[in-house]
Amino acid sequence: MSYNRTLHSTTSILKMNSALQISCLLLVLGCLLGSGHGQSDAEFAAKSREISQIFGNPSVDKYTKVRNLPALVAFYEKYSSRLRLTAQEKKGIDNAIRQYRAQQNQKVDGVSAQGGTLFDILKKVVEVIIKVVV
């Protein structure tokens, strides 16, 4: 009889330990996810300011803006769900980015295309994103 009681007690303790471990794991995950969301809010705000300073400032030269187009595209792709865009604006931006990527992928003698109309393709995108971010 004492063997059954000991076995029962050990089983209860194992179940309790498992429940405690799962609770701790859920608590840690909750904290990580919560702080991750807070970090992404801060990161979104910082990236928005950075994009606005580059593309929303008329004193920044065209070369600097063209050089930062990949950052603008990455910003849009990462945070597009946070930007308040109409369906038409979103469709236009997606099409412009598709054109931009197609032009970036074109090779001339094994080298990516340089300059050209890259900025012109995304000029409207820049205007819409800056309007939404600011």
Curated annotation (Swiss-Prot):
Q: What are the record keywords, sorted?
A: Immunity, Innate immunity, Secreted, Signal
Q: Which function does this protein serve?
A: A humoral factor that may play a role in stress tolerance.
Source organism of this protein record: Drosophila yakuba (Fruit fly)
Quick one: signal sequence residues?
1-38
Q: Give the protein family.
A: Belongs to the Turandot family.
Q: Which InterPro entries match?
A: Turandot (IPR010825)
What is one Gene Ontology biological process annotated in the Swiss-Prot or TrEMBL record?
response to bacterium
Q: GO cellular component terms?
A: extracellular space
Protein name as it appears in the record: Protein Turandot E
Where in or outside the cell it occurs: the entry states: Secreted
Is Transcription regulation one of the keywords UniProt gives this record?
no
Give the gene symbol.
Answer: TotE
